């Protein structure tokens, strides 16, 4: 948190309205160095661009990861600005013919096929273009899976090929000369916080992939193990134990004889969540029908994650004594307070009824762990408020 304090003080000293995203690119580099250097030799890290696709974020990340995982033509184009096409993998449901043609024409590394119909459409495009394409089949396993915030499989969802249909899709893919089936893509859980349980999930992936490869007699070259590594917003001191996971993961690879299979992770939240801060100031404090509210500059149209996940987002308060007005600030202490934005909706809530020691108008609120699924998923122009400004902290300077 100390890294953002000088920036906040500078903004306040200049009487600059405080409503910013601040990204710690130095911390991002250190994090990426650690996680990528600890992976086994047959494992590669891809960045799931959907978590945050700001150009300076992508530029920094591109120097450490094998490539980008993308889910649209627009994301392919963003990725191509920093990586060649053979370092881009294309997944996600509902790919259009236009997107598939674009991916094929650009030469993306692999396409993760989500259904028999998508496979047939891709094959028709390849025949029309007289090209070949490496693919993985995304499988929606039946489960059961460990506890996690989000489940992408094991229950009805729009993702992947139902496990009971996989055999038919494999046979179809193997019969298509333009299709090179390299293996499987699994992404069954999201925001898992237990590193030991994550190893168990990977073990299940290995078992399923090997069984299908042996049954259908094709070489298993590649498994995408998804992302799914979580962030604990409720307790920032108790996060996913990456080092423990990697050590057990390495052992599992040897035990399951997977050393000759290329393994991928496609992480997003785990890579960028902790390096972002949404910083805003208190405009008003008032009591309505017995409940205290602090109204902040901006709102969830800029930082939607707390509404999307229905949680109280972690924050710190920077107190400021200066008062630009001739009348007193509004101040409260030791009150349960709800932090809201400027939107004309009661759903515009960052944190609800949280105990606050002291808060005044003019104070600055710093929402931590705002680097993933913040600005990128928000409805920016609701009520036409100004957009936040963006500051990127590097070794030598602040970039805006």
Curated annotation (Swiss-Prot):
InterPro entries recorded = Ala_racemase/Decarboxylase_C (IPR009006), De-COase2_C (IPR022643), De-COase2_N (IPR022644), Lipocalin_CS (IPR022272), Orn/DAP/Arg_de-COase (IPR000183), Orn_de-COase (IPR002433), PLP-binding_barrel (IPR029066)
* Keyword annotations from UniProtKB, A to Z: Decarboxylase, Lyase, Pyridoxal phosphate
Q: What does this protein do?
A: Catalyzes the decarboxylation of citryl-L-2,3-diaminopropionic acid to citryl-diaminoethane, the second step in staphyloferrin B biosynthesis.
Q: In which pathway does it act?
A: Siderophore biosynthesis
N6-(pyridoxal phosphate)lysine modified-residue sites = 50
Name its species.
Staphylococcus aureus (strain NCTC 8325 / PS 47)
Which cofactors does this protein require? pyridoxal 5'-phosphate
Q: Which cysteines are joined by disulfide bonds?
A: none
Stated name of the protein: 2-[(L-alanin-3-ylcarbamoyl)methyl]-2-hydroxybutanedioate decarboxylase
Instruction: Please list the GO biological process terms of this entry.
Output: lysine biosynthetic process via diaminopimelate; polyamine biosynthetic process; siderophore biosynthetic process
Give yes or no: UniProt keyword Lyase.
Answer: yes
Q: Which family does it belong to?
A: Belongs to the Orn/Lys/Arg decarboxylase class-II family.
Q: Which residues are pyridoxal 5'-phosphate-binding? A: 228, 266-269, 373
Q: Which reaction does it catalyse?
A: 2-[(L-alanin-3-ylcarbamoyl)methyl]-2-hydroxybutanedioate + H(+) = 2-[(2-aminoethylcarbamoyl)methyl]-2-hydroxybutanedioate + CO2
State the gene name recorded for this protein: sbnH
List the active-site residues.
344
Induction pattern: Up-regulated under iron-deficient growth conditions. Repressed by Fur under iron-rich growth conditions.
Output the Gene Ontology terms for molecular function. carboxy-lyase activity; diaminopimelate decarboxylase activity
């Amino acid at each position: 948190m100390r890294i953002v304090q000088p920036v906040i003080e500078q903004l306040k000293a200049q009487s600059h309205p405080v409503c910013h995203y601040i990204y710690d690119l130095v911390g991002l580099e250190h994090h990426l160095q650690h996680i990528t250097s600890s992976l086994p030799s047959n494992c590669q890290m891809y960045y799931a661009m959907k978590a945050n696709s700001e150009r300076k974020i992508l530029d920094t990340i591109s120097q450490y990861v094998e490539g980008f995982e993308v889910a649209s033509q627009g994301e392919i184009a963003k990725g191509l600005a920093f990586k060649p096409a053979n370092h881009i993998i294309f997944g996600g449901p509902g790919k259009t013919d236009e997107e598939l043609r674009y991916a094929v024409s650009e030469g993306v590394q692999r396409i993760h096929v989500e259904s028999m119909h998508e496979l047939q459409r891709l094959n028709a495009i390849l025949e029309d273009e007289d090209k070949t394409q490496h693919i993985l089949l995304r499988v929606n396993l039946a489960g059961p899976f460990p506890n996690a915030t989000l489940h992408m499989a094991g229950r009805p969802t729009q993702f992947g090929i139902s496990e009971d249909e996989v055999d038919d899709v494999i046979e179809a893919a193997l019969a298509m000369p333009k299709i090179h089936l390299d293996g499987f893509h699994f992404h069954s859980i999201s925001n898992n916080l237990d590193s030991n349980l994550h190893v168990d999930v990977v073990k299940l992936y290995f078992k399923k992939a090997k069984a299908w490869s042996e049954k259908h007699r094709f070489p298993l070259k590649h498994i995408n193990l998804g992302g799914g590594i979580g962030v604990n917003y409720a307790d920032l001191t108790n996060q996913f134990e990456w080092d423990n996971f990697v050590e057990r993961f390495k052992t599992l690879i040897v035990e399951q004889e997977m050393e000759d299979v290329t393994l991928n992770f496609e992480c997003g939240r785990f890579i960028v969540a902790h390096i972002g801060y949404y910083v805003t100031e208190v405009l008003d404090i008032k009591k309505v029908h017995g409940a205290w509210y602090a109204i902040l500059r901006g709102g969830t149209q800029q930082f939607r994650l707390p509404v999307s996940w229905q949680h109280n987002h972690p924050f710190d308060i920077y107190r400021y004594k200066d008062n630009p007005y001739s009348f007193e600030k509004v101040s409260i202490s030791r009150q349960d307070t709800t932090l809201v934005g400027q939107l004309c909706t009661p759903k515009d809530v960052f944190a609800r009824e949280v105990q606050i020691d002291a808060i005044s108008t003019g104070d600055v609120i710093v929402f931590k762990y705002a680097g993933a699924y913040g600005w990128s998923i928000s409805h920016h122009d609701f009520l036409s408020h100004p957009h936040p400004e963006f500051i990127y902290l590097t070794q030598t300077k602040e970039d805006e």
